[in-house]
């Protein structure tokens, strides 16, 4: 269960007006729920027998197998812990109560035309679980995002070098508004911290965890970024293969000039030998014909063409 729960992302939810991060797993006959307000982390784990006992205790008028109770509970509880809008969880009314170190989420719905009550009675989570489910993955995510920023900075540097090469060979922008200054990574970092970051109004109790961060959390926590990070386009296997291919193309294009020159030189030698051999086996041509052959030979010579004419 721990591994399955680790693969799930934290989702921002609002229960009875309180903002929380939730992580919930519902199996065939058991569940486990984690909730946090970034001050405390609560959890509850229940199995079949415990679910049957609590369902009978909270719903005296209902008599049903444990599987029927659990199936209905899943249908009304999953939306509550998935961050959906209130209109989408109208099948159940949710209430939140905190007593000391305990947190209770109360749900009220209908089953077979009768009220169905359920309570998630969560207690504080051990520190080891908090580290496994929250602290370690978030630290790993910061490393991944830092590497992603470094890759983007390196890409911008290569783009600047490419633009400079175009400019040195006479390329001119058609629209002046598109012109940009060369990217300087240290200056950008300083400006981001001193100018942009204060405008973001980021607080330490922010519960923002959007879909992109959820996807990154799942990738990091499932071990997909162990030796080869797959969520950065520049470091993906396809991108690495393309980078190697591009490097080979650059190397091949760099050696094209000498190779063509050497090939033309060898061809000229071969042509010269062939002409000498033919002249020994045939009658001498007139001076006019010789002049025409020489002019034709000069016309057939190739002229080297570079990237810029």
UniProtKB/Swiss-Prot annotation:
Annotated Pfam families: XLF (PF09302), XLF_CC (PF21928)
Coiled-coil portions: none
Cellular localization per UniProt: Nucleus; Chromosome
Compositionally biased residues, Polar residues: 253-265, 273-290
Gene Ontology CC annotations of this record: DNA ligase IV complex; nonhomologous end joining complex; site of double-strand break
Chain positions of motif XLM: 299-309
Keywords of the record: Chromosome, DNA damage, DNA repair, DNA-binding, Nucleus
Amino acid composition bias (Basic residues), ranges on this chain: 297-309
Disulfide bridge positions per record: none
Domain of life of the organism encoding this protein: Eukaryota
Ranges of compositional bias, category Basic and acidic residues: 243-252
Single Gene Ontology MF annotation: DNA end binding
Region annotation Disordered: where it falls in the sequence: 223-309
Role of this protein: DNA repair protein involved in DNA non-homologous end joining (NHEJ); it is required for double-strand break (DSB) repair and V(D)J recombination and is also involved in telomere maintenance. Plays a key role in NHEJ by promoting the ligation of various mismatched and non-cohesive ends. In some studies, has been shown to associate with xrcc4 to form alternating helical filaments that bridge DNA and act like a bandage, holding together the broken DNA until it is repaired.
Assembly behavior: Homodimer. Interacts with xrcc4; the interaction is direct and is mediated via a head-to-head interaction between N-terminal head regions. Component of the core long-range non-homologous end joining (NHEJ) complex (also named DNA-PK complex) composed of prkdc/DNA-PKcs, lig4, xrcc4, xrcc6/Ku70, xrcc5/Ku80 and nhej1/xlf.
Written domain comment of the UniProt record: The coiled-coil region mediates homodimerization. The Leu-lock (Leu-114) site inserts into a hydrophobic pocket in xrcc4.
Protein name stated in the entry: Non-homologous end-joining factor 1
Organism: Danio rerio
